[in-house]
């Protein structure tokens, strides 16, 4: 039986993890977000704040997005937050927007398995938030084109910003705030290249 054939009561009996497995993940995969370079599930991007209480320290709760969609490993495009079906479609939006702000991501999505709500943080479109059916989730190409339009990149600038980061072979990758700083620097260089040509 397909997700859309289930009754509301049946849908609400599933946990968030089940609903992701049955509905949200297949919808994202069907939009060609299948490769590990484009899609990361349960994406931890902080270790949690260090909390000091007298002589004892412990870590607070780590921040974890349900899904982060990437153009390339260090160019995040979208956050998708899932809630179980007892919630409305948009109930995860505030969390998605908070994470999108932290990760400097232009697109935020929320879903309860019935559809998606998209929030466009670019300010370029006429509609900031809209509902998208499960079978109409945007492809990597569509979101990348919207991102390039938002940034105003020409082909040369796109080549600059998509150039791979240096890899020293250690297996370590930059933290989210380092990725943000690197990407902002590369973006500024790409925009300056247009002036000096």
Regions found by a protein language model. Give the residues of each.
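ATP-dependent helicase/translocase motor core
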Residues: 1-195
């Amino acid at each position: 039986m397909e997700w859309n054939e289930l009754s509301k009561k049946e849908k609400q009996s599933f946990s968030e993890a089940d609903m992701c497995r049955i509905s949200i993940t297949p919808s994202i995969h069907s939009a060609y977000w299948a490769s590990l370079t484009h899609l990361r599930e349960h994406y931890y991007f902080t270790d949690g704040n260090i909390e000091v209480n007298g002589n004892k320290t412990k870590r607070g709760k780590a921040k974890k997005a349900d899904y982060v969609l990437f153009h390339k490993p260090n160019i995040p495009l979208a956050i998708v937050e899932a809630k179980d079906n007892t919630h409305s479609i948009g109930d995860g939006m505030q969390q998605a927007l908070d994470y999108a702000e932290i990760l400097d991501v232009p697109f935020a999505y929320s879903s309860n398995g019935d559809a998606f709500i998209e929030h466009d943080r670019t300010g370029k479109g006429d509609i900031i938030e809209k509902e998208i059916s499960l079978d109409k989730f945007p492809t990597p190409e569509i979101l990348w084109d919207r991102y390039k339009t938002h940034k105003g990149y020409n082909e040369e600038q796109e080549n600059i910003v998509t150039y791979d980061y240096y890899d020293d072979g250690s297996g370590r990758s930059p933290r989210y705030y380092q990725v943000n700083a690197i990407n902002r620097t590369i973006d500024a260089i790409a925009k300056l290249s247009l002036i000096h040509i």
